[in-house]
Amino acid sequence: MAEILSLIGTSIPYLTNTLHQIASFPDLIRYLFKKSNKETDSNTPIVILLPHKPPATSTSQLEKLSFSDKTLLLTYFFNHLNLLILDENFDKAKTEATVAEASRLLKNRISRVGNWTGTTHFNCGTDDCLYDTQSKIAGVIPTMSYVLNVNASRSVQTTEQLIHFKDLIVKEIDFFELLENSSPERLSELCFAVGHWSFPAHELSNDDLVYCVYLMITYAVQHLQHEDPEDKSFHLLTANELLGFVFIVRDTYRNGNPFHNFRHAVDVLQACFHFVIRLGSLPPFKQFITDPEVEFEARSDGATELVASKDRLDNNIAHLNPTQTLALLIAALGHDVGHPGTTNDFMIKYNAPTALLFNDRSVLESYHSSVFINKVLAVCWPSLLAKKSDTKTELTVRNLIISSILATDMGEHNEYVNRLKSFKTNNEILNHDNTVKLISALLIKCADISNVTRPLRVSSQWAMVLSREFAEVETLKSLINHEDDAASIIDLTQDLTYDHVPDNLQEILTLQPKLQNGQIFFINLFAENLFNNIAELLPQLQYTCDIILHNKNFWLERAKH
């Protein structure tokens, strides 16, 4: 069954799970953007019924688009929602077959992950139903390889069309009105949330997180504009453009992933944001809390944006200029777009098409950077990609974003730690561009695994959702290894759901009594060495080491009992 969104006054009774009559095409776009405040995957196809000819009397430029243009717009901006777009003359039998096949594939969370990655066929009517780009079902449930190919091979003309559509959307859709709670009090509270190292990501809705991103990127752009007002080739996004950009980035993440979702992206961005403030690359702001161990408590002061402070933090010499700082923050925001909720090891072991394409090297990170650059930024902010990172260099923001995202591959972790040690002791002499790339890479790496450096309650929340995602991967492995007997592993007719992450440490420990095992392993193997070395190079980040040590001692003590 499917959700039906009809703009032609017609429903499809034999397919209808939920029916919404939509008054106009702009209203349809608003509805689809708002859907991603829900923190689940789309587990049913959405059938959109559009009139083949646009209404002659409408004043909306979006409404006046042709059927083919509307189809292109919808499939570009909302393909994560599993859309089947039809006009009045749809073929009943073909539509019913497509919806039935899509419904079967989408029903279960583990099945969805297998289908996205291209590692399973056990629930598919034909082996190539998802992986053949000419297949109708491939467009309804876009796999990773489908998304990669469509966006990497898109023509210049199509890109220009999509930029035009984006401009129309920004002109006609007020993204601030799409936020679930845009009251001044709530927006002010979010300013203070951004200012805390104990960033309460799991107590914030997806819409709250969108506004948090808006706050941080706006602050960085304002600083860039102040430092470099003469760059006329760089397009400064309006407030509505920037918020729309964040909505679009959010829609590129898989909301149902327990860990690698939009919330994680915002958390990594917020960690990078704190790093660059403490390192002097951005000035501190009024809502910034210098004590990293203070627990967040909701408060507001009426300010709905971050207010720059006149006071600078002590002994700060900027390590990145304003353009490089913005590049790092944007890379953090997009560093996991399209993440399927698996690991590189999984993708390689089970011959995922993307692993074959990227020769088993940084598979997911290569995918994230390609999709973020070619699908999102090339349409939403092309002038940012072309911007030089410095007046004396050929290194562009695009180059920095790619190198930063690739650095988040944990398979390359030891190599970066060794480079850090060499750089720290002056054994490795780098030119200016490579120094900027290394500093950016190290900061995003630290931010990516900063969960263990957050105060214990927040850190344990992240540990809990990560354990959920690892458990899903193990279930998927079992399904692949026993495809002939999938029903004995999991009921594919039922979806997998989770309770909301508790905000109380003791409740988390009750639900996950062995949480300390993974935390001790990760801190010992990866985090402690990286953060101790980065703090020697950048002593302003010493606080991360102090919190890691406190958390580690807690987990070690718990492991004794």
Feature locations, PLM:
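Short hydrophobic beta-strand segments
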Residues: 1-7
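Divalent metal-dependent phosphate-bond-processing catalytic cores, especially two-metal-ion Mg2+/Mn2+ enzymes
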Residues: 143-208, 215, 219-223, 278-281, ...
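All-alpha helical catalytic cores of prenyl diphosphate-utilizing isoprenoid enzymes
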Residues: 235-238, 258-267, 297-301, 337, ...
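Eukaryotic serine/proline-rich intrinsically disordered regulatory segments
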Residues: 289-311, 488, 492
